[in-house]
A protein has these predicted regions:
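Iron-sulfur-associated redox domains of electron-transfer enzymes in respiratory
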Residues: 1-201
Length: 201
């Protein structure tokens, strides 16, 4: 019997959620024995076209961390929603927008102007900014568009479960993955975490 397919993906985040998965240490080996990891850009080399070629709903579960800030992130969130039976908002940024959501206090233009022109550590005499499309040596690279606002994952696609934390602890992650694999899932929309604060443990 084939193992359930699992994907990990990150959007606008710091990388701490990915680090938690790595911090499972030897416990990750037990997870890897039970699943087939089909996407994990931080650790393994997979291409978007590989995911696009998969049948819809063929990924058992995707843990997606990070807020949605760019056109590429939104596109991947929509693709992974379509390909996954269970889409899990993993970490504070995916659940609520987290620290990246603080950017919503400022217009996009103000953020770009400060970062590329006005910050005290920036030297940019020509006021050059990244362009969505440009030509260089006969190539036409495309960059993702930065959206006007930062959104949580459930503001873009339907989310099945939430795993909170900044980042979620390895213990919480392991328990949530075990619940998924064992079929011990609460109703959709539930938070896969205890009802107590982390500091109470």
């Amino acid at each position: 019997m084939s193992k359930p397919k699992v994907a990990f993906y990150w959007c606008a985040s710091c990388g701490g959620c990915e680090e938690t998965v790595v911090d499972l240490a030897e416990d990750i080996l037990a997870v890897v024995e039970k699943v087939d990891i089909v996407l994990w850009p931080v650790a393994l080399d997979f291409k978007y076209k590989d995911i696009e070629a998969m049948a819809d709903q063929s990924i058992f579960a995707t843990l997606l961390n990070g807020a949605i800030r760019s056109s590429e992130q939104e596109s991947m969130a929509r693709l992974l929603r379509r390909k996954s039976r269970h889409l899990i908002a993993y970490g504070s940024c995916a659940c609520t927008g987290g620290i990246p959501g603080l950017a919503n206090q400022f217009p996009r233009e103000q953020i770009l102007k400060f970062n590329y022109e006005d910050a005290p550590t920036v030297v940019n005499e020509h006021k050059t900014r990244p362009q969505l499309v440009f030509e260089e040596d006969g190539r036409h690279p495309h960059l993702p568009e930065l959206h006007q606002v930062v959104r949580s994952l459930d503001q873009v696609v339907e989310v099945d479960y939430y795993i909170p934390g900044c980042p979620p602890t390895p213990k919480l992650t392991q328990a949530a993955v075990a619940a998924l694999l064992d079929g011990r899932l609460p109703p959709k929309g539930s938070v896969l975490a205890p009802d107590i604060a982390l500091c109470e443990e």
